Amino acid sequence: MNPDYWKGKTVVVTGGSSGIGEAILSALSKIDCKLINLSRTQPELLKRKGAFPAELLHIQTDLSSEREIDKAIKKISKEYRGIDVLFANAGVTTHSRFDGTRIETFRKTFDINFFGPIYLIQRLLPQIKLNVGTVIATSTVSGLYGIPGRSAYSSSKSALHAVLEAARIELSEQGVSFVIFCPPYTKTKLRASGLDGDGNPLNEGYYPSRKIKTPEEVALKMLNAVEDPESRLVIMDSSGFFLKWLRNIAPAFLERTLFKKLYKDFH
């Protein structure tokens, strides 16, 4: 991370009250920049004693609600002129079989992971264009292939990928950058606040993996990705490359591998 890159920039972060979003805010709070957090709850950063160089504004927002996004945009437009970076970070996971997931749960997952982010991006786009800015979306390797036990989650992220890839090409002449960032398993509340097939909270703990990352590790990689003008699809660990490669080279082998590895997740 290059602190000089971020000096004076105006940065919007969604879901900054915990996890990766909070880690992004924490890292940037040490730099003289303007930070705007959109989330339902206030970031811990604002509750701590002592000043920090960054200017931080929290706007309480339900990111699945167009009405609340509109209110947040109105406040941002009144306070700031131009956005340099948007971290579209807020999201929800859903764990259940395809035939055990209610259509209402699919809709709720898409409202948070797809419709919310693209509506926010569309509404902020005039401000982002003004500063020739960057949009970086927190996604998942589950968006690269349909993962068993994650049909709603995978499909919502795959849809987001497609929109941002199209937007990247369409807006390339105006200099707007779009980055899709796929972190590995991370120590966040994602599984605790996720949904089961009926739309109820999962209340699951961290994924049992020796390779699990901290939010701070992921945030640093995301900040580096924004700084790199060549960033497009950034995959942080080998599992994502494995999925991308095998889906084209050996799809039947990939399906058998996922069936065995994730069998307990959909039975």
PLM regions with names:
Residues 31-46:
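Conserved glycine-rich Rossmann-like NAD(P)H-binding loop of the short-chain dehydrogenase/reductase
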Residues 140:
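Residue(s) in the substrate-gating loop at a strand-loop-helix junction
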Residues 61-71, 103:
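The beta1-alpha1 cofactor-binding region of Rossmann-like NAD(H)/NADP(H)-dependent oxidoreductases
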Residues 173-238:
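SDR active-site lid
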Residues 97-98, 102-107:
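Substrate-binding pocket helix/loop in short-chain dehydrogenase/reductase
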Residues 17-18:
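Conserved glycine-rich cofactor-binding loop
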Residues 121, 156:
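Active-site helix of classical SDR
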